[in-house]
Amino acid sequence: MRKVMSLAAFAVLMSASMALAAEVKMLNKGAEGLMVFQPALVKIEPGDTVKFVASDKSHNAESIKGMLPEGAAPFAGKMNEDVVVTFDKAGVYGVKCMPHYAMGMVALIVVGKPDNLDAAKAAPQSGKAKPAARQTTT
């Protein structure tokens, strides 16, 4: 009986540690306009997991070069598929939808204390992503 209880307690702890901290929708139209991540700004703690949901077609979620903490692994989801990412390192992570990046479809994940905020702000952006990225990092 003790063994069963120990296994049950372990299962509960593991499922709690893998719980989602946030869910971000990839949308053609949202509260902030066309081609958006909603929400566009998420604040979490190291080790938390975010699910990027392909609510509408023709979207993906991938990291933006130059907008990752040092030593963090880049990620790139496939088109029209949900992406689940665990953010282990503290800092600012820029996220883009590759097909709609120039239209400003960007999001920001702030994990713990953002030591790389200045570097993230200085990262080159293109098209409408430039003001959108600036807005999310202020």
Q: Each predicted region: which residue ranges?
A:
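Extracytoplasmic copper-binding redox domains, predominantly the cupredoxin/blue-copper superfamily
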Residues: 20-138
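Bacterial N-terminal signal peptides that target proteins for export
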Residues: 1-7
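Bacterial N-terminal signal peptides
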Residues: 8-16
